[in-house]
Design a protein with these regions (language model features):
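N-terminal beta-alpha supersecondary unit
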Residues: 33-107, 111-115, 144, 148
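Conserved phosphate-binding catalytic cores of ATP/NTP-utilizing and phosphoryl-transfer enzymes
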Residues: 27-34, 141-163, 363
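A short helix-loop
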Residues: 29-34, 42, 49, 59-60, ...
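Glycine-rich phosphate-binding loops at beta-strand->alpha-helix junctions
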Residues: 314-334
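Active-site neighborhood for divalent-cation/phosphate handling
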Residues: 114-120, 126-128, 133-157, 176-177
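Adenine-nucleotide phosphate-binding core of ATP-dependent small-molecule kinases
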Residues: 242, 247, 251, 260, ...
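Conserved phosphate-binding/catalytic loops in two-lobed NTP-binding clefts
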Residues: 141-142, 317-318, 335-360, 377
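N-terminal mitochondrial targeting presequence
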Residues: 1-33
């Protein structure tokens, strides 16, 4: 459709008005809606964002350390801390400037304080406590996984309770979200998280040397290469087939993959650190096994929820989030399970699945609305590197020992 020039000009002026109006003190929206600044530094992203109460993002800024950590072969906490220290002030300043919001207009500051890398959490928390004291603003400490779980509600109305699968570089958990700060933990990883496994497999395969993968995270590199791979050329056993609970384990799979890589290196007569000819097939088989493992544990969690009336009978929902949730193949695997069990599957877009300041600000909005966990600026808060989410129900899930009817995991590439 073509637009008349005059109509286009009017639209342009309206859009200009909308963007200048955002966040300005005299603007109805900013004046009537409470504003929250969110700050994230739990791992390797320095993020900040200002949101209004409706979930409108007024301004955001994100500094990713990904490329630095790719070069050093993983996150070195002291390096992460230094990069947060160098960037936090600028990132927060940018988010405020882009929103056209002055600190005096904020209703609260929300910051990730758990779980995460101690050195990284410390930078965000110290900055935030100084900031709230300086501007005399309430402080809302945020649980990073609670924020991942609630992000979807910023984008569309999703009523509690819903089931959530959170998969990232640091976490793997299944929980029922019953309220903003009310979770039932059904499953968690017993060793490492799927993103960590994919990052380590990518490193072992030296994918950083692959022309298409030099700036991609391990998970992204595996997803890209798997598209041209034949997953049937390597057969890895899906973990925990004989354990009838909803917990996860990925270390054994990583071991299987490493052994396969070593065998291939010997066959091809090449040294570790050289790209194998079969990287696409190994990527495809690894991704498939991760996807199948996540799908099976989630299937059992859905059956447990159904047996115990933990989800509503009308539009029961599974929310998939966290960095690994941006993987399209994994999304398809989960959609096979939700289709078979009558749930709707919701995944935030990739940019909201990985760590960012927006999700923290949104969690602040949710808590502000309900008046939960809002502290005066003077209260001293400590960060917690380890912090479980919700009430631990993993023993009850295990005791239920639910057997799965087999669902064919024919996942299209
Ligand atoms: O949520 P996130 O940004 O940070 C943590 O809290 O860990 O997740 C980062 C993780 C990394 O391990 C990365 O390899 C993985 O998410 N990841 C992916 C994809 N994109 C990022 N894993 C699989 N497929 C992807 N497309
Ligand atoms: Zn995360």
């Amino acid at each position: 459709m073509t637009m008349l020039p005059s109509k286009a000009r009017v639209l342009h002026r309206l859009l200009q008005f909308r963007s200048t109006c955002f966040g300005s003190p005299s603007c109805g929206k900013a004046a009537s809606s409470r504003l929250v600044l969110g700050i994230e530094t739990s791992c390797d992203e320095t993020g900040a964002a200002v949101l209004d109460e409706t979930g409108e993002i007024l301004g955001e800024s994100l500094h990713s350390q990904k490329v630095v950590h790719l070069r050093t072969g993983g996150v070195i906490p002291m390096v992460a801390q230094q990069l947060h220290r160098e960037n936090i002030e600028r990132v927060v300043q940018e988010a405020l400037e882009r929103s056209n919001v002055d600190p005096s207009q904020l209703s609260a500051v929300a910051t990730t304080v758990k779980p995460g890398l101690a050195l990284s959490l410390g930078i965000g928390l110290k900055f935030s406590q100084k900031f709230v004291r300086q501007h005399n603003k309430p402080f809302i400490p945020i649980h990073h996984m609670e924020a991942h779980a609630l992000t979807v509600r910023m984008l569309q109305p999703v009523a509690f309770p819903f089931l959530v699968l959170l998969v990232s570089g640091g976490h793997s958990l299944l929980a029922v979200a019953r309220g903003v700060d009310d979770f039932l933990l059904l499953g968690r990883t017993l060793d490492e998280a799927p993103g960590d496994t994919l990052d380590k497999v990518a490193r072992r395969l030296s994918l950083i040397k692959h022309p298409q993968c030099s700036t991609l995270s391990g998970g992204q590199a595996i997803e890209l290469l798997a598209k041209d791979g034949d997953r049937t050329r390597f057969r890895f056993t899906t973990p925990m087939g004989q354990t009838y609970d909803c917990c996860f384990s990925f270390a054994g799979l990583r071991n299987q993959v490493t052994m396969a890589i070593m065998k291939k290196e010997a066959e091809e007569g090449i040294e570790q650190g050289t790209l194998l000819s079969c990287v696409n097939d190994i990527a495809a088989a690894t991704q498939h096994t991760v996807a199948t493992h996540l799908a099976k544990r989630t299937h059992r969690a859905i059956l447990f929820c159904k047996a115990n009336g933990l989800l509503p009978s009308s539009s029961p929902t599974l929310v998939l989030s966290g960095g690994v949730a941006s993987n399209q193949y994994i999304r398809k695997a989960l959609s096979i399970i939700t289709e078979a069990t009558g749930l709707q599957l919701l995944c935030p877009p990739a940019k909201f699945c990985t760590d960012n300041g927006v999700m923290i600000a949104w969690n602040g909005v949710e808590r502000l609305r309900e008046g939960k966990g809002i502290l005066p600026p003077s209260v001293d808060v400590c960060y917690e590197p380890k912090a479980p989410l919700g009430v631990d129900m993993t023993a009850e899930v295990k005791a239920a020992a639910i057997r799965l009817q087999s669902i064919r995991m024919k996942i299209p590439n």
